[in-house]
């Protein structure tokens, strides 16, 4: 269905392309005018464009002249002139589409066109890359063009201090990674002072390698978390309990859908091992979650595939790039479960402080566009989720690459033997070879065989990635053999004969000179030598057939296969690609189905030798069918993540909007009467609902004492009318507030009200996020009861959010009414505010903020530092009241909707507070 839909939706693409070509003709007509300008005249164009925009001209009106200006500025600064097809790509970006451009077509240069044009509005342009290296490289390289034209450029980097980020965002164009932009948005909605916010809106984003960021990363939400419960022992117990379970008897697993669950037999075994009567009787859902994560860790996540263990630490491997994702941890306890399985230190579980999916983050932009070499296969998803179509941009030169038919072997061993033979033969002929693998295991396996045969080669995987860009840049040298997991080195062109700039640095190092310390004369001499070597090798490599890309396995996504193919044949260069498959490959085994089993049986029946491959259209179709199945499953999973986050996204927008209003000076004093009336009305109805003889006046009085800290309450009897009772309670609360205001002074009270409300919002929101995490973990079980889990989730999330809002205002009143000012709150610095936060979900994370202490303490100094009459601060789980040291009642300070202090996981009103 997605492919069919994509074809229908793409019918207008050719029409758009024709329109873009007409605009290119206008740009080309302006080129002589731009060439005739002096540098000063060309630079003055920017201010003229800004003035015209301010007077009412649209960016579309300015486009031809602006693009012609950038093209000429590029020639004068970095010596590169935009091709016509690059101008088309720039127009596509400006129009809010995804430009699919083949590898080597100069996507980085294309971004300068749309970036410059949209920066003229003054609202800021975000250029998003997949890693810090590319963000820094592109900001410096393309920044030369921007700065020549008077456009400021900002750069976000992993570990950058927050004080340096504000200037970066205030620049006309800001470069950074997707996770850095996303985390900054979340952090902006956790700060306690308006000047600590760094972002200034979401006007326009250009996403480089857009498929990697908006598709591959979309299943993983961005999460800022703090330290939560300590349950390392529980993880270890469950890891032992699930070890040794028998597939299909003790548990059922669907690798295609990434699901696993115990059978009744298996559940009984686990419960016996743990000495637990009924895991599913745990109302908190935590034991069920421990079981689920232990099963996943033991049977679905494998060392050196999804993760590696380095120096006693479990590190995630990006399944699409093969890179280690430093600083990132699986959520919902899965990472701890893997640590327990691998018998390394189990780090304490984190509590979510703020979270958002990449889908919902990028949907906030007024205009979104992107660039990649492979997007058309995901056109339907881009349209459905992001409302952004894909525009295929024709290549500047025809593609000369030869894509050979797949070779399919019966066994994995036979396949790898054939791969090595092919590599050896091409290496001897001087043809460079790039071998793509899907796992670290496979890359190391091929490396071992090549080493035994004396073939020099480079390995790029999650374990060896320090000089990734340099190694991949030289993968086109004569006879070079490079083994890379998937798309390691993406974003770096492979030039036939080698990259002279990288080679020049190597020449200097071989002479004992650090490139940064070399004189200009030394640099020029090294570059001259490198250019001569590269030119000679380029001729030899071209004669040998160009770069050969060998794929050792089809990826689950055709797009990833196309990315691997795209490393060869750039800019009209010759090249070849060849995929080697086996019937034992994961893709074939998991998704091939009965027909693939039939092919295997046929090969066995005719006793075909292991080293004899088959080439048959039926096998190719089966492979494509298997990939199509996986793509549908993965799309459904990403859509599922979005469906669930959409529920919370609306709630997040409400909470963050309220926070920002307070930060921007919203006067809470004006709301006190409304908040008081709505809170007292709700509570009076809760305690005194129905007939008077069923009223819980004692409970109401306890609540009122807890709320205000006073014992001289109005007198209530069963003879009092409900309306009068509600009026008396409201008046009493309002009077208490007025007295507090008079005592502290109105200005002090106004400031404290804002700070207290921020703290209450943050505390309640964190608790709510944790509750939603547990709800999502167990909601899938509702499907067994013939109920739609998503509908159930929406219903319960709505009820929980309603309760959140109600208790939020109640907590605010409770804190403000009982608060005693002892000194002015100490203003917390940005370092204190986020030093305890932990970041997960993106490949690049904030490196100087790894400490895992008490996460909620980041809010402590930001809130009003006050004391109750007993001299203590607010509790962590809620902003509650406080028990006197001589009070024998241990529950006097516990709110009815707070977690019960006994540790059961239930709310207090459903546990020890049931009869109170």
Give each language-model segment a name:
Residues 1-607, 657, 673-674, 678:
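Conserved P-loop NTPase motor core
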Residues 435, 483, 765, 801, ...:
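Hydrophobic, well-ordered secondary-structure elements that form the walls
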Residues 4, 378, 431, 479-480, ...:
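Generic detector of short, well-ordered, non-transmembrane alpha-helical segments enriched
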Residues 111, 419, 884-887, 895:
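Active-site-adjacent structural elements in folded domains
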Residues 890-909, 913:
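Short Cys/His-rich zinc-binding micro-motifs
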Residues 308-315, 321-328, 548-550, 571-572, ...:
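Extended, charged helical/alpha-beta scaffold domains that provide interaction surfaces
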């Amino acid at each position: 269905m997605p492919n069919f839909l994509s074809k229908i939706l793409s019918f207008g693409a050719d029409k758009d392309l024709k329109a873009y070509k007409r605009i290119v003709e206008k740009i080309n007509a302006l080129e002589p005018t731009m060439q005739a300008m002096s540098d000063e005249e060309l630079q003055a164009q920017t201010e003229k464009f800004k003035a015209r925009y301010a007077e009412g001209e649209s960016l579309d009106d300015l486009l031809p002249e602006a693009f012609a200006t950038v093209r000429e500025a590029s020639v004068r600064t970095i010596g590169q002139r935009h091709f016509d097809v690059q101008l088309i790509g720039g127009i596509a970006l400006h129009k809010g589409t995804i430009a699919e451009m083949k590898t080597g077509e100069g996507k980085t240069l294309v971004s300068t066109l749309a970036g410059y044009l949209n920066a003229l509005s003054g609202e800021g342009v975000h250029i998003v890359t997949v890693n810090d290296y590319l963000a820094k490289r592109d900001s410096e390289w393309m920044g030369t063009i921007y700065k020549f034209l008077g456009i400021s450029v900002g750069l976000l980097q992993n570990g950058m201090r927050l004080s340096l980020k504000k200037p970066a965002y205030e620049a006309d164009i800001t470069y950074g990674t997707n996770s850095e932009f996303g985390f900054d948005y979340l952090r902006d909605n956790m700060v306690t002072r308006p000047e600590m916010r760094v972002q200034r809106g979401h006007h326009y984003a250009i996403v480089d390698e857009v498929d990697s960021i908006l598709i591959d990363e979309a299943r993983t939400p961005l999460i800022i978390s703090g330290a939560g419960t300590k349950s390392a022992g529980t993880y270890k117990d469950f890891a032992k309990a699930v070890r040794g379970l028998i597939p299909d008897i003790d548990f059922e697993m669907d690798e295609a859908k990434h699901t696993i669950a115990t059978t009744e037999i298996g559940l009984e075994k686990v419960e016996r091992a743990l000495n637990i009567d009924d895991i599913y009787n745990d109302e908190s859902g935590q034991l069920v979650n421990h079981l689920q994560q232990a099963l996943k860790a033991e049977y679905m996540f494998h060392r050196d595939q999804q993760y590696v263990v380095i120096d006693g630490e479990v590190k995630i491997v990006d399944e699409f790039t093969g890179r280690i994702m430093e600083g990132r941890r699986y959520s919902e306890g899965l990472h701890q479960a893997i640590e327990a399985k691998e018998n390394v230190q189990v780090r304490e579980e984190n509590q979510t402080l703020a979270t958002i999916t990449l889908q919902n983050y990028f949907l906030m932009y007024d205009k979104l566009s992107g660039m990649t070499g492979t997007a058309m296969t995901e056109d339907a998803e881009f349209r459905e989720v992001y409302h952004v179509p894909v525009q295929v941009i024709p290549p500047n030169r025809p593609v000369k690459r030869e894509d050979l038919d797949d070779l399919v072997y019966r066994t994995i061993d036979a396949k790898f033997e054939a791969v090595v033979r092919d590599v050896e033969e091409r290496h001897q002929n001087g043809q460079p070879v790039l071998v793509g693998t899907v796992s670290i295991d496979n890359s190391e396996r091929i490396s071992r065989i090549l080493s035994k045969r004396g073939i020099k080669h480079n390995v790029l995987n999650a374990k060896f990635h320090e000089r990734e860009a340099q190694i991949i840049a030289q993968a086109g040298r004569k006879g070079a053999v490079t083994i890379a997991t998937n798309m390691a080195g993406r974003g770096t062109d492979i030039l036939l004969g080698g990259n002279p700039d990288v080679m020049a640095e190597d020449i200097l190092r071989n002479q004992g000179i650090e490139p940064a310390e070399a004189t200009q004369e030394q640099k020029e001499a090294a570059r001259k030598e490198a250019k001569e070597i590269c030119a000679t090798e380029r001729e030899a490599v071209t004669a040998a057939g160009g770069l050969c890309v060998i794929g050792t396995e089809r990826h689950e996504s055709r797009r990833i296969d196309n990315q691997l193919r795209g490393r060869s044949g750039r800019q009209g260069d010759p090249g070849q690609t060849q995929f080697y498959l086996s019937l034992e490959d994961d893709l074939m085994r998991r998704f091939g189905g009965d027909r693939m089993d039939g092919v295997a049986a046929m090969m066995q029946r005719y006793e075909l030798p292991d080293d004899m491959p088959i080439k048959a259209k039926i096998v190719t179709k089966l492979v494509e069918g298997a990939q199509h199945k996986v793509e549908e499953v993965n799309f459904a999973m990403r859509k599922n993540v979005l469906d669930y986050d959409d529920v919370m996204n609306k709630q997040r927008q409400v909470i963050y909007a309220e926070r920002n209003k307070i930060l921007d000076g919203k006067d809470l004093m004006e709301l006190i009467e409304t908040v008081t009336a709505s809170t007292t009305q709700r509570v009076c109805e809760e305690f005194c609902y129905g007939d008077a003889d069923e009223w819980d006046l004692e409970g109401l009085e306890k609540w009122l004492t807890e709320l205000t800290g006073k014992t001289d309450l109005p007198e209530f009897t069963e003879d009092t009318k409900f309306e009068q009772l509600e009026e008396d309670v409201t008046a009493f609360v309002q009077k208490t507030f007025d007295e507090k205001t008079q005592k502290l002074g109105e200005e002090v009270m106004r400031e404290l009200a804002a700070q207290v409300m921020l703290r209450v919002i943050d505390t309640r929101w964190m608790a709510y996020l944790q509750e939603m995490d547990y709800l999502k973990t167990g909601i899938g079980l509702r499907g067994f009861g013939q109920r739609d889990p998503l509908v159930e989730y929406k219903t319960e999330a709505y009820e929980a959010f309603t309760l959140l809002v109600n208790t939020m205002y109640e907590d605010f009143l409770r804190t403000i009414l009982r608060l005693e000012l002892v000194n002015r709150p100490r203003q917390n610095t940005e370092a204190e505010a986020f030093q305890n936060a932990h970041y997960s979900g993106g490949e690049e994370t904030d490196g100087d903020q790894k400490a895992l202490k008490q996460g909620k303490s980041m809010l402590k100094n930001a809130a009003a530092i006050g004391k109750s009459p007993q001299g203590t601060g607010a509790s962590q789980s809620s902003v509650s009241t406080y028990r006197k040291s001589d009070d024998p009642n241990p529950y006097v300070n516990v709110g009815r909707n707070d977690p019960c202090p006994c540790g059961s996981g239930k709310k207090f009103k459903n546990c020890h507070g049931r009869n109170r």
